[in-house]
Design a protein with these regions (language model features):
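Conserved P-loop NTPase
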Residues: 1-4, 104-107, 116, 172, ...
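The Walker A/P-loop phosphate-binding site
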Residues: 1-84, 99, 103
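Flexible beta-alpha connector loops of hexameric P-loop NTPases
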Residues: 11-14, 39, 63, 83-92, ...
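Conserved nucleotide-binding/hydrolysis micro-motifs of P-loop NTPases
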Residues: 42-44, 68-72, 80-83, 93-97, ...
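Loop/turn-to-beta-strand initiation segments
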Residues: 61, 85-86, 106-109, 146-153
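Short regulatory helix/loop adjacent to the ATP-binding pocket of P-loop NTPases
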Residues: 78, 162-172
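Conserved P-loop NTPase "ATPase switch" module shared by AAA+ and STAND
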Residues: 105-125
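Substrate-engagement module of ASCE P-loop NTPases
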Residues: 131-152, 156, 172-183
């Protein structure tokens, strides 16, 4: 253990997300080793927002893990958006295989789209179940804290308005950002509802 006076109070450098609104909602950028949950209703644009963000991070080695779309589908969306073609795409739902790929490519940021599609062989439940979601999120949290590599989890809000099965994920992750809006309006809102490293009073449009 360290004595309190031995610990530097200097803020750890944050990762620039190349999106002023997202940076502000995060509290000034993404904290290394943190785990962020981006939640919202299915179809509101969580995947597009995240893909758009990482495609503009030219100086970062990013691994985008999709359990919902094929590489071809992601490629088509990425071409429409434009940006960093060096982003690595992995279509996988096994948490163990995801970790094997992470060890191989050594990314600086990992995106999981979505946490409801990922499963671990340690749990005898189907993907998307409360037990699977909780165990996978906890394993990804341990990975982020020990490696210093930040993880962004995309999670769907159900009809009751909760993230990925009651509020179980909100207690595990460092930051929860809710992506809100209406299909009839042009603008969407990013709302921070939990942030260990910043304010929860910030909104992004």
């Amino acid at each position: 253990p360290l004595h309190l006076h031995e610990i530097s109070a200097q803020d750890e450098p944050r990762i620039d997300m190349h999106d002023a609104e997202l940076n502000r909602v995060l509290g000034g950028g993404l904290v290394p080793g943190s785990i962020v949950l981006l939640g919202g209703e299915p179809g509101i644009g969580k995947s597009t927002l995240t893909l758009q963000t990482i495609l503009h991070m030219d100086n970062r080695r990013v691994l985008y893990v999709s359990g919902e779309e094929s590489t071809h589908q992601i490629k088509m969306r990425a071409e429409r958006i434009g940006g960093n073609s060096e982003v690595m795409i992995l279509c996988e739902t096994s948490l163990e295989d995801i970790f094997d790929n992470i060890k191989e490519v050594k990314p600086e940021l990992v995106v999981i789209d979505s946490i409801q599609t990922i499963s671990t062989s340690d749990v005898e439940r189907s993907p998307g179940s409360i037990t699977q979601v909780r165990e996978c999120a906890a394993a990804l949290l341990r990975f982020a804290k020990t490696s210093g590599i930040p993880v962004i989890l995309i999670g769907h809000i159900n009809k009751e308005g909760t993230l990925a099965g009651p509020k179980l994920l909100e207690h595990i992750v460092d930051t929860v950002i809710q992506f809100e809006g209406d299909q009839h309006y042009m603008y969407r809102i990013l709302r921070s509802i939990k942030n260990r490293f910043g304010s929860t009073s910030e909104l992004g449009i």
